[in-house]
Every structure is written in structure tokens, then in C-alpha cells.
């Protein structure tokens, strides 16, 4: 395991995150949307392997826009547990891909898929020109 916490003092793992919305509601969305739960679990487990103790994980959320509001959050146990489950699933998928020599993406069966322009881009009326 390799991790680089932004700050570690032996009592907590701290990660600094820039965000659009540092409110608890906004930042909890960022945690879910950006996979910060996976990172938190990985860091907590990695530091436990080194220290022998499961330490709290703290997020320092800093808004990108002035006045750059700041909030400090401690990840609740559910965040860590959900992150662990996602991490385990990702590692199982990685192992399967390596063992099978297959890296499925958008066409897992290898089929060729027909693709079309989006409806808005196929509007040819916008491109007609009357020179008369």
C-alpha cells in the first residue's frame, strides 16, 4: 500500500481538498462523486498497517472561490466501510482482468457498435444557405 496523506501527526490522517461547496451537504456529494471514500479507506487501512492503530480520517475542505470558506470534517465509519467495499471490488476486478488478459470497457464483448451524431449536431437545417 502506498499513500501520501497531506498531513499526519500520529493521531489522524488529514487530507486537504479543494471544492466548489465546502458545506456538509455539498462536500458529502463531492466525497461520493469523486471517490474520496475509497481514498479515505485506503489511507486509513494503510496507516493501520504501519502504526497498528486505526486512526480517524479528516477532510479539510477549502472552497476554490473567494472568500475560500474552509470546513473540517471527520469521515464517519460508513464512509470508510463503503470505501473499503469499493476498493475491494476494484481490486477483485483488477485481478480478474489481469488473470483473464481482458480489459473490458465500453464494449465488453468486443462487438462493434454503430454510433451516430447527437440529435442537436445532426440538425442540417442550421447549415442550409440560400445564396439567392
Kindly give the residue locations of the regions a language model identified.
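Metal-dependent nuclease catalytic regions and adjoining charged, substrate-binding loops involved
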Residues: 32-37, 42-132
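Alpha-helix initiation and capping sites
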Residues: 1, 8, 33-37
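Metal-dependent nuclease catalytic cores that hydrolyze phosphodiester bonds in DNA/RNA
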Residues: 1-3, 107-108
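Conserved catalytic cores of phosphodiester-cleaving nucleases, focusing on short active-site segments
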Residues: 3-29
Amino acid at each position: 500500500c502506498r499513500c501520501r496523506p497531506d498531513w499526519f501527526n500520529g493521531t489522524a490522517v488529514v487530507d486537504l481538498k479543494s471544492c466548489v461547496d465546502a458545506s456538509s451537504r455539498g462536500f458529502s456529494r463531492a466525497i461520493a462523486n469523486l471517490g474520496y471514500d475509497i481514498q479515505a479507506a485506503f489511507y486509513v487501512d494503510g496507516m493501520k498497517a504501519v502504526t497498528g492503530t486505526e486512526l480517524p480520517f479528516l477532510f479539510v475542505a477549502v472552497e476554490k472561490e473567494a472568500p475560500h470558506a474552509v470546513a473540517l470534517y471527520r469521515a464517519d465509519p460508513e464512509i470508510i466501510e463503503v470505501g473499503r467495499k469499493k476498493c475491494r471490488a476494484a481490486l477483485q476486478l483488477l485481478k480478474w482482468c489481469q488473470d483473464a488478459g481482458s480489459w473490458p470497457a465500453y464494449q465488453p464483448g468486443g462487438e462493434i457498435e454503430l454510433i451516430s451524431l447527437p440529435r442537436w449536431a445532426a440538425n442540417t437545417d442550421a447549415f442550409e444557405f440560400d445564396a439567392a
